[in-house]
């Protein structure tokens, strides 16, 4: 997903008052679907736009995002899928590394910052 697509989704959800979570990959080890800096948005209804894995982590991230929104507190998650015996995460689809993801709430009470300002600057940088 491109940055512009992510921003369009953000603007759409924000205009409808949807609380959301910005999930950012901040570290990886080994083979992972995405690398540091990759982001997805997760809505309060567990809808998400983008992927940080080949589909093996997004469901869990959506559940964690719900807790992040309830507490209005960020959360750092580590998913270690390097153990071949761990079929829960790896699923044999290229998710056999370690990935660390930072989840931060984007809510109306703080004007969806810091992503609101980032989106504004990116959309006007042409």
Task: Report each predicted region and the residues it spans.
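Segments forming oxygen-rich coordination pockets for charged ligands
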Residues: 1-126
